[in-house]
UniProtKB/Swiss-Prot annotation:
Stated name of the protein: 3-hydroxyacyl-[acyl-carrier-protein] dehydratase FabZ
Cellular component GO terms, alphabetical: cytoplasm; membrane
Keywords: Cytoplasm, Lipid A biosynthesis, Lipid biosynthesis, Lipid metabolism, Lyase
Species name: Bordetella avium (strain 197N)
Disulphide bridges: none
One Pfam family it belongs to: FabA
MF annotations from Gene Ontology: (3R)-hydroxyacyl-[acyl-carrier-protein] dehydratase activity
List of catalytic residues: 49
Broad enzyme group: lyase
Function statement: Involved in unsaturated fatty acids biosynthesis. Catalyzes the dehydration of short chain beta-hydroxyacyl-ACPs and long chain saturated and unsaturated beta-hydroxyacyl-ACPs.
Subcellular localization: Cytoplasm
PANTHER family: 3-HYDROXYACYL-[ACYL-CARRIER-PROTEIN] DEHYDRATASE (PTHR30272:SF1)
Catalytic activity as recorded in UniProt: a (3R)-hydroxyacyl-[ACP] = a (2E)-enoyl-[ACP] + H2O
Chief location: cytoplasm
Length: 151
């Protein structure tokens, strides 16, 4: 299944400047997702990272992977929005084995690929990769917690 920005914004609470997913190219709920972030010189972080040699901060690449993984949690097996999506929060609680292979710069299109390794009602584990022009630029294992907003 694919999602445009409207579908993404229905599922994620993030908004500018922290919404780091522009489009979902394919998603198999509970299994995998491929998403895109178009990296523009107009991104606010480029003002200070670095003014004369702009590079996307690695932590934001990992955040984009986490946002892609969150889309799993707010999408049911039929591709619709889960009934409890507005009642739960999704937190990044662990990052292991993060590696950054090359800089991501303005004009790059970041392809984010995430595969579910373990899903439960409260803890999820994923393997994430980010590519530019087919070349691996970053990878990490992510652990996320799902919590009720009523807790």
């Amino acid at each position: 299944m694919e999602l445009d920005i409207k579908g993404i914004m229905e599922r994620l609470p993030h908004r500018y400047p922290m919404l780091l997913i522009d489009r979902v190219l394919e998603m198999v709920p509970g299994k995998s997702i491929v998403a895109v972030k178009n990296v523009s010189i107009n991104e606010p972080f480029f003002n200070g990272h670095f003014p004369h040699h702009p590079v996307m901060p690695g932590v934001l690449i990992v955040e984009a992977m986490a946002q892609a993984s969150a889309l799993f949690s707010f999408t049911d097996d039929n591709g619709g929005l889960k009934a409890d999506a507005g009642k739960t929060a999704y937190y990044l609680v662990g990052i292991d084995g993060a590696r950054f292979r090359r800089p991501v710069v303005p004009g790059d299109q970041l392809r984010i690929e995430v595969e579910a390794e373990r899903l439960s009602r409260t803890i999820c584990k994923y393997q994430g990769r980010a590519l530019v022009d087919g070349q691996l630029v970053a990878e990490a294992k992510l652990m996320c917690a799902i919590r009720s907003l009523e807790e």
